[in-house]
């Protein structure tokens, strides 16, 4: 499994407009081969974190290179982000617990 951790800080006053773009990108991500899930969080200090999971690197790469996603990335750099970072990780081990 490939996990992408995307951390960003938005410019003042753009959150509502940005969320509309992010919602569209989330819809698009779901159509990519090997897509598993994604979740986004806003922290109190203004940082936004999105975690995206793909079954394999090919799916993540297809997502990264998708033309609509590339256009959205460019727009976000120009208009919405003060800063961002991306970490791509391969899961070496996974553990979980669910109380019934």
Go through the PLM ranges and name each one.
Residues 1-48, 55-67, 81-100:
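Short S/T/G/P-rich N-terminal loop/turn motif that feeds into the first structured element of a domain
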Residues 78:
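Cytochrome P450 substrate-recognition site 1
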